[in-house]
Amino acid sequence: MSRVSQARNLGKYFLLIDNMLVVLGFFVVFPLVSIRFVDQMGWAAVMVGIALGLRQFIQQGLGIFGGAIADRFGAKPMIVTGMLMRAAGFATMGIAHEPWLLWFSCLLSGLGGTLFDPPRSALVVKLMPQQRGRFFSLLMMQDSAGAVIGALLGSWLLQYDFRLVCATGAVLFVLCAAFNAWLLPAWKLSTIRTPVREGMTRVMRDKRFVTYVLTLAGYYMLAVQVMLMLPIMVNDVAGAPSAVKWMYAIEACLSLTLLYPIARWSEKHFRLEHRLMAGLLIMSLSMMPVGMVSGLQQLFTLICLFYIGSIIAEPARETLSASLADARARGSYMGFSRLGLAIGGTIGYIGGGWLFDLGKSAHQPELPWMMLGIIGIFTFLALGWQFSQKRAARRLLERDA
């Protein structure tokens, strides 16, 4: 085995261990934020939506800057610093008794994510030149298992004190920072040492990539509801916060049994864009009836459909984003690819929280879910138009040649 192949093989296992620590640290805390502050402390859902949206927007919206800096200085210092900032954000969240302090904790958490997320994604692109889609599927399976373990641990700790929940998340991110500081080599992310401004400019001039990323905002408006409206809905229907962990258990079971087989089968028979659109359509249609159900079994059935759509769409979305990235500025591209999540996540959290409160006060609980479903359908149509334009341009070039 060549030294390059050996480094990539070891890097794969490093990425899997690192990813598990990050997922555990995140899911111990964030699925319970809406339960803690809306259900236990009686805050309006929009207040918590602002906090979650702020974290999402800062982490993903500023990702291009984190990625561009990592292109210039390397992955290691950015990852270690970002994880320590995330730990500080969780520690602050544990003592939040006013909205501004919750918002500040999410600000710190988001800034940490801005620093560590793009270089981690770029390392996957760098180390997995072949079978990248399958590795993204493995990471998603790991995400699902880690989400359940984290949510179970967080739910158990919440019975005693929310500060224990946040302290556990903070400790896990400190451990992750130490793991990276100790074992992560000083790898460069890009094929050349790209100046910060040049990397950002290269992305902004790539109109096809920019349009694709911004269109995905609609996809993310639906996807982020697993952190806000779906846990609140499960809690309302079940009458107990402990039921939320079963929502993540469903995701884990589906991911561990279906994600990798579906990814392997579909990559042989369908284009990436078709897989993304099919998954998005299933997610959109499963959202629409959520506000009309009154039983936990019906709700979990719709959540199953939503997760199946995500299982189909997410590996294709991640692989498509990576395949469109320029190797000369990987960090910048992977950072900018998070902008759709920043915009869609922020609107999804704040708008979703506002619509949830509005629907509740107007006795129209189906309102936010129908709106999200319609947004998903429009995003599906927009992506279909983009992909058809790309195929038409390719056929024109082939004909001219």
UniProtKB/Swiss-Prot annotation:
Periplasmic side: 34-98, 159-163, 234-242, 297-298, 360-366
A Pfam family: MFS_1
Domain of life: Bacteria
This protein's GO CC annotations: plasma membrane
Membrane-topology descriptor: Multi-pass membrane protein
GO MF term (any one): transmembrane transporter activity
Residues exposed to the Cytoplasmic side: 1-12, 117-137, 185-212, 264-275, 320-338, 388-401
Compartments where found: Cell inner membrane
Major localization class: membrane
UniProt keyword annotations, A-Z: Cell inner membrane, Cell membrane, Membrane, Transmembrane, Transmembrane helix, Transport
Transmembrane spans: 13-33, 99-116, 138-158, 164-184, 213-233, 243-263, 276-296, 299-319, 339-359, 367-387
InterPro entries, per the entry: MFS (IPR011701), MFS_dom (IPR020846), MFS_trans_sf (IPR036259), MFS_Transporters (IPR050171), Multidrug-R_MdtH (IPR022855)
NCBIfam families: PRK11646.1 (NF008650)
Protein family according to the UniProt entry: Belongs to the major facilitator superfamily. DHA1 family. MdtH (TC 2.A.1.2.21) subfamily.
Identification of the protein by name: Multidrug resistance protein MdtH
